[in-house]
């Protein structure tokens, strides 16, 4: 029997799903993170997981985004052959109208991150359209839809290899994961696609990430196929790398490994790998012609009773900070920042460097200040600023030396690790790099007491803001001597776990 899917039902269902995943983690993710928190032995990593879980509950209660990067929308549709759409526009246009409405919803405006003309103009589309949409035609009279929002930090760490038929997939994964740094915001998942062609392997990897986390169940009952054996082997060995939550070293780097495969040409073995971050966001629903889809929200009582103890953190007055005080900070120290910080990320840094190269004066005085790599969500209601978690710091590495040396900037705040060139620039300038927890954007935003755009307003969420913060939680990631916790801690925990020999990269 033919099923009629009405245009408004499709649009509203997509809109509702995008709002839903902006503030609700999937329940399986919450449970897996809770177990990771209970198991974790490294205090820094345990604190990071605690902040992610506390932020998750705050977002569920307040209906505000888990992460300021509310992602590029991925939509997977399985359309029954006996379905007829009652549309006045194309199916793509109807889905994108749902995206538009979802991101512009006045009660919970989501950050628009999608840029048109990617090679040249890179102009923000303002409503996060278009989505990346995939279709399958299947038997039946219903439409199954999966909606996901994929942030740049994890998506940018996607990997593809055209392996030889005899190459080891496990060896490739273990060689590749350390090169991804911590910008993908672990703990999360790795989706792995094996076979097909290059684009098929990547599609399989992305689709695998939509599956439910069930590694603990698999470990309890034991593997029942070679694929399950492979999942367990990769899971155990990746965690044995000791990368840990946010790259701080620890027992849990991945919560699960998901693998999908497809037949491939005899001459090769394509393998794609895509991580899902601590802001895992996806929802699944079905349209059967009866109206708008309903997605079951997790219950607040399902969230763990986790607290974050800040009593051992040092309070810092950024408006009166001295070089001597910064010299005393050690990697792993937790700080509570108070005072003035400026924001600036990719586009702002590019513009500042262009101005410096042209001999122009910058619109803000950064001498003795800290700059926070963030693109916040617009505020709603009485908020000072919307969710404002850190963006991946390595994208600013190429600007770091020039900005430090030209402005007298004291330090930077961002997400995850810094590359060798940035660490060297930090050391040479006796600066410092502080790390805020990725995936805890709403929690971080509560520390912002004042916010105003002070430069580059045309850049939208990439404008430079002046923030006044109160007890903003960060950790020292690179000290004035150039010692990086992301370089030292994983080696320590890899040795403690003891399953994989620690090899000094300098010896290779």
Where are these regions (language model features)?
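Non-transmembrane, aqueous-exposed alpha-helical and coiled segments at domain scale
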Residues: 1-192, 197-309, 405
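Short, solvent-exposed amphipathic alpha-helical segments in soluble enzyme
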Residues: 163, 205-209, 272-276, 289-291, ...
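C-terminal binding/interaction regions
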Residues: 249-257, 264-265, 278, 446-508
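Generic structural signal for buried aliphatic residues
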Residues: 335-337, 341
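Feature captures the catalytic cores and cofactor-binding loops of soluble hydro-lyases/lyases
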Residues: 209, 213-242, 246-249, 343-475
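Short, well-ordered loop/turn sites that connect or cap secondary structure elements
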Residues: 328-329, 335
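Short, structured beta-strand/loop micro-motifs enriched in basic residues and often containing a Trp
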Residues: 311-321
């Amino acid at each position: 029997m033919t099923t009629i899917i009405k245009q408004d039902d499709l649009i509203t269902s997509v809109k509702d799903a995008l709002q839903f995943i902006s503030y609700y983690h999937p329940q399986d993710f919450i449970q897996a993170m809770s177990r990771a928190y209970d198991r974790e032995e490294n205090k820094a990593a345990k604190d990071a997981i605690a902040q992610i879980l506390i932020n998750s509950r705050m977002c569920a209660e307040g209906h505000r985004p888990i992460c300021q990067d509310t992602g590029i929308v991925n939509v997977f549709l399985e359309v029954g052959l006996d379905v007829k759409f009652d549309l006045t526009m194309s199916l793509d246009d109807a889905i994108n109208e749902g995206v538009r409405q979802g991101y512009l919803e006045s009660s919970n405006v989501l950050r628009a991150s999608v840029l048109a003309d990617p090679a040249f103009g890179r102009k923000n589309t303002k409503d996060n359209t278009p989505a990346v949409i995939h279709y399958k035609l299947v038997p039946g009279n219903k439409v199954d839809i999966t909606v996901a929002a994929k942030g740049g930090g994890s998506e940018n760490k996607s990997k593809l290899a055209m392996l030889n038929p005899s190459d080891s997939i496990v060896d490739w994964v273990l060689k590749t994961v350390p090169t991804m740094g911590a910008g993908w915001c672990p703990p999360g998942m790795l989706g792995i696609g094996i076979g097909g062609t290059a684009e098929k392997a990547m599609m399989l990897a992305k689709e695998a990430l939509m599956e439910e986390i069930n590694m603990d169940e698999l470990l309890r009952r034991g593997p029942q196929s070679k694929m399950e054996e492979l999942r367990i082997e990769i899971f155990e060995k990746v965690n044995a790398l000791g990368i840990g939550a946010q790259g701080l070293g620890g027992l849990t780097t991945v919560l699960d490994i998901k693998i999908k495969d497809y037949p491939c040409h005899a001459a090769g073995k394509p393998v794609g790998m895509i991580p899902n971050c601590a802001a895992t966001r996806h929802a699944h629903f079905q349209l059967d012609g009866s109206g708008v889809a309903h997605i079951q929200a997790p219950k607040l009582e399902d969230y763990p009773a986790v607290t974050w103890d800040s009593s051992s953190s040092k309070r810092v007055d950024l408006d009166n900070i001295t070089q001597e005080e910064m010299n005393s900070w050690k990697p792993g120290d937790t700080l509570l920042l108070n005072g003035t910080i400026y924001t600036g990320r990719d586009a702002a840094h590019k513009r500042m460097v262009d101005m410096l190269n042209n001999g122009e004066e910058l619109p803000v005085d950064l001498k003795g200040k800290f700059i926070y790599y963030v693109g916040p969500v617009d505020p709603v209601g009485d908020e000072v600023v919307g969710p404002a978690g850190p963006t991946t710091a390595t994208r600013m590495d190429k600007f770091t030396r020039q900005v430090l040396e030209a402005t007298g900037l004291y330090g930077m705040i961002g997400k995850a690790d810094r590359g060798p060139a940035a660490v060297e620039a930090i050391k040479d300038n006796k600066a410092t790099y502080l790390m805020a927890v990725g995936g805890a954007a709403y929690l971080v935003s509560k520390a912002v007491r004042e916010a105003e755009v002070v430069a580059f307003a045309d850049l939208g969420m990439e404008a430079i803001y002046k923030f006044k913060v109160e007890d903003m939680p960060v950790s020292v990631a690179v000290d004035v001597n150039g010692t990086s916790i992301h370089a030292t801690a994983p080696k320590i925990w890899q040795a403690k776990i003891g399953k994989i020999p620690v090899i000094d990269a300098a010896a290779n």
